[in-house]
UniProtKB/Swiss-Prot annotation:
The gene is Mamld1. It is found in: Nucleus. Residues 312-340 have a biased composition (Pro residues). GO terms for cellular component: centrosome; Golgi apparatus; nuclear body. Belongs to the mastermind family. This is Mastermind-like domain-containing protein 1. Signal peptide: none annotated. It comes from the Eukaryota. Residues 592-622 have a biased composition (Basic residues). Transactivates the HES3 promoter independently of NOTCH proteins. HES3 is a non-canonical NOTCH target gene which lacks binding sites for RBPJ. Required for testosterone production.
Amino acid sequence: MDDWKSRLVIENMLPHFNMVGNRQETRKLQESGTSKRRQEGENFHFTGMADGSYPNKIKRPCLEDVTLSMGPGAHPTSLSTEMQMPTLNMNPTSADLGVAGQSLLLENNPLDSNVVNSSAMGSPFGVPSTADTGLKGHAVPYYEKNNSMPAVDQELQDLLEELTKIQEPSSNDLDLEKILGSKPEEPLVLHNPQAPLGPPAKLPVQMPHMESLGSSKEFASSCSQVAGTSLPIMPSSTGMSYSIPSSSKQIVSSSSSTAQAQVKNQVQNMLPVTMPPLSVPQWHHAHQLKALAASKQGSATKQGSNRNWSSLPPPGLSPPYLPVPSPHPPPPQPPPPPFSPQNFTASCMSSSSLSGSAVQSSPNALLSSMAPSSNASLGPTLPYVPAKLPGLPLNQQPQFSPQSSILANLVSSSVKSPQGHLISALPTSTPGPSPPYRPENLSSPGLPQQSFTPQYSLIRSLTPTSNLLSQQQQQQQQQQQQQQQQQQQQQQQQHQANSIFKPMTSSQQPKTLSMIMQQGLSSSSPEAPEPFTFSNTKPLSHFVSEPSPQKMASMSTHSRQSSLLHYLPQATPAHAPSATASSTATATLQLQHHHQQHHHQQHHHQQQHHQQQHHQQHHHQQQQHQQQQHQQQQQQQPDQSSFLLQQIMQQPQRFQRMMASDSMPALPGQGCCHRCAWTSTALWLEHQHQQWNSLTSTHGHVPPSNLTHVDKACKLGEARPPHVSLGRQPPSRQALGSESFLPGSSFAHELARVTSTSSYNTSEAAPWGGWDPKAWRQVPAPLLPSCDAAAREAEIRSYGNDP
């Protein structure tokens, strides 16, 4: 511990040495003063990684790396790469330089930072490769530690919290990088500080090349290629060194998976297995890949490390995820091999120490959640990374996109709830990651999301439940996955049962969260996700596309409902009522039209009816309010509501047909028939309302008998869009809608009075005593027809039959 602290101090000093290469390093180091302190503790963690005695702390550095990368947010991967690169550079000087300089560059210019990194930081990056090599030595213990460390969650949570609070992840990353890089690097790379610097120069070249490739793709490629060279951890380079390595593939799969939703569980479970592979054999390759990844990440960071989390090099990561990029990296790859030992360190750093040792794995899960980790996980957590990088798709399935994990409190964060929550918060701030969570994004990025099959099964289960994930992601991801699967089934059932109501129920909570995130994030996520989705995600895109349509459908339904809701004063409480309301509103309008005819026929009864109706409407309003509350409660009971909606939606058709037959006769002679048919309809409505009440009676409101079909009609009418009630029947609309007509007939007057009073906006309506066209106007149009129809129905039901 003390030794490492001294090393940290030395590393802190080293950045000054590196300052020759990069002046910003000192400033960065100063910025990271506290970060370094933290990293010193983390250094202990790394020591723990090396020694196996500080697993948690190791994780912390990983988290720092991951979260720091997240902090920049733009390029979690880039940041991670930066961090990793510098740490790898820990050739004591260049590493710090690379880290600090790159961090500064990242902070200053996410896009330029890569270029700067290429030059000033480029060498640091190159060194990071060396540093990776240096880290490599510890990388094995690091991974192993990660595997063995259950404290990862706590550490990750702490780190995430700190990261959330700290927006200078670059400085933290630099410190961590220095710590990580210096610790492994010092053993491996310290002897080579300048040599890494030389390679760093190469790395800068490679980095520019990667940059040219589109840092993400190149990064992925380089990682992949290095992976080919050093299959194990190159993915770390690509994705945090998780993905690409072939030998690392197990690690990648496991790491990715672990980094993914199961970062913790899988990391602990799989990483143990995969970590060993990452160990020495992969380290070399991983370090090489790491060097490439560091340079790549540098470019990725450059792209917008802070800006677009989803924009992150996730695309780059994604490419790494695809081995295809692997050939791409060949140019950078050669330098990485020189640094392969350090590269591995960078890889570990990169991938949050690759799979990042379980410790970093969790952080890596965060990183993964962030693009970088996603990249790192790309190989291992291909699903997780794609989910994350594609995050867009992921966003649909919170499953594993950084966005998803973030939005959904990170499925991955579900895996590590604390991280997930923190990252959720972080990614939440970064809409980019969140959008992947969005189902909408899922369709486009979602493809990549599920393109990562390893956890695709999980992702698929999560994808449908992404909305629920947003709600439940706070829970353990495994539990979430199970629950989400169940919920997904339920949602699917509900969706099938009632696509309209389903958005209500499933989206009520997720809707706000997932809908907002989906909408807001989906816009941002498509940007980053698309790159990810390119070749990586497309293979599995067909998988995601299916879930995404559902989510998008639900989303569209949500948007439709939301669009309708603002029309419906009380429709919002119950979306299902709104759906029913539209159909019921039509029936109500028809009834209203019939009632108008009947009303004209029985105009002499209208006075009494109106009074009674007025009385009823007061009672009815109360009932409606109760019903509204009840409906709100009903929404909480989606199953009943959906079932009820189905019945209502089905019944309204019959009711409409009945009403249509009723509306046909306009002659007074047929008035009785209208009355009878309408009465039967009213009874049917009442019965339906009773059913509704029985379904929702658990919350108990006015007894169904007390609640007349009029009440239900008013409620439904309110719920339904105003245009529906007015537009369905021109006659009733004329009677209700045209003031010239309304004042013309006592029916109009009564209707106006009833309407104004029956509407929930009765406060605006004129007194019962008289009818005020203006007051009537004040009442929402939809409410007027529906409430009028409801009031009349109440009248007719109770008094309409009296001669």
